[in-house]
Amino acid sequence: MEELRGYLELDRSWQRDFLYTLILQEYIYSLAHDHGFNRTIFLENAGYEKKYSFLIVKRLITRMYQQNHLILSANDSNQNEFWGQKKNLYYQVISEGFAFIVEIPFSLQLLFSLEGKEIVKSRNLRSIHSIFPFLEDKFSHLNYVLDILIPHPVHLEILVQTIRYWTKDASSLHLLRFFLYEYRNWNSRISIKQYISFFSNRNQRLFLFLYNSHVCEYESIFIFLRNQPSHLRSTFSGAFLERIHFYEKMEHLVKVFTKNFQVILWFFKDTFMHYVRYQGKSFVASKGTSLLMIKWKYYLVNFWQCYFSVWSQPRRIYINQLSNHSLDFMGFLSSVRLNPSVVRIQMFEKSFIIDNAINTFDTLVPNIPMIGSFAKEKFCNIFGHPISKPVWADLSDSDIIDRFGRICRSLSHYYSGSSRKKSLYRIKYILRISCARTLARKHKSTVRTFLKRLGSEFLEEFFMEEEKVLSLILPRDSYTSQRFYRGRIWYLDIFCIHDLANHE
């Protein structure tokens, strides 16, 4: 009982005071600059990062609130455009620092939770590829999957309320509201979905923090119910409700949960339920029946709408059978298929042949989306035929080969866990021929001439570094080497989806 309360109850000691004062510290902006996701603002304003000082930071905040200097002549459109960009610069700088500051309570809580526990603090745990071995082990035994588009909050105040759980500094919350509503005011005619897209492009770090903190709020309850089915019947619902105490629908929640709590607990009895989230999607896979998945679908819709004021619709959740459906997951097409095998058993003078089928989790390179990405970047046409890259034709030969080679090696590294290498070889072929066509275009020659001139050295640029290492360690004709070349290898140093593999 105490363990459950410790999980659900609000730990007020982690609420941070006076985060707002850190905004006036110039070192915060240096740290935000070093770890920020988007550095284009500093690259476009050369030398700006060297001018940070206490006075400049205060001046930026002052100008954010002073709108009079932006009221210029309506006829002078160029001047208005200049001041609009400058105002955007002020918001960009301050919001990056603010995003770094509000992450502090979460970082401190994570470090505290690791103290006294034998948990390896490895960067490899951050790799997005670490999820695939888990999927290979679990999903091959499951039947159905819910393909969920995570809904966006219907109001900006919901994001502010989520941060209220972690800090009681009112000034910081007011500043957060100011950022959100100022971005909203600039684009008052756009929808909430368009606004979120606009805001995420302008300030990725702050948006990712707000989005993840909001999603983690309902995930903490969702996953808790999934992991603790045997203890919930003896748990008072008040402890469960305390987790989301700051929502205004407290009285309604108490009535609903007191009345229907036993029904909800029965709903979470499936011990074969697995949950995976990435970007704006999530998967809930189960070994249950289609009827159970339909109940899950409508429960999630009501869960978001009633308890978290998040608008969702049943059509945003798709029920699919794993054996007949492929998941578009982090640039891979993942599916569960039957892998037939024949076993011959010899018993004395008689022999038996047994047909056996085992479910395997396949991860494939999606051909059509990849060709679409390559066509968009001008490596091939929409049919997959390699073409030259005119933008790179002015570079030196070594730079052209190096750029194509790095793209090829990075894609090979990313798709090293693919079940079938044929599609990966197709990608290498497109890049290799596109490189040759670009060089031929530069020197006004033919592709065949360049392939003859460069020979094997040209092909080596498109090998993975891992393949070179394996070829040095293991003989090409050895059984172990062949298994490495044909098998799946998941590398734990990949922290984001490859740009060409991101088909969202």
Curated annotation (Swiss-Prot):
Its main location: plastid. Keywords: Chloroplast, mRNA processing, Plastid, RNA-binding, tRNA processing. GO terms for biological process: mRNA processing; RNA splicing; tRNA processing. GO terms for cellular component: chloroplast. Belongs to the intron maturase 2 family. MatK subfamily. HAMAP family: MatK. Usually encoded in the trnK tRNA gene intron. Probably assists in splicing its own and other chloroplast group II introns. This is Maturase K. It comes from Nepenthes gracilis. The lineage of its organism: Eukaryota, Viridiplantae, Streptophyta, Embryophyta, Tracheophyta.
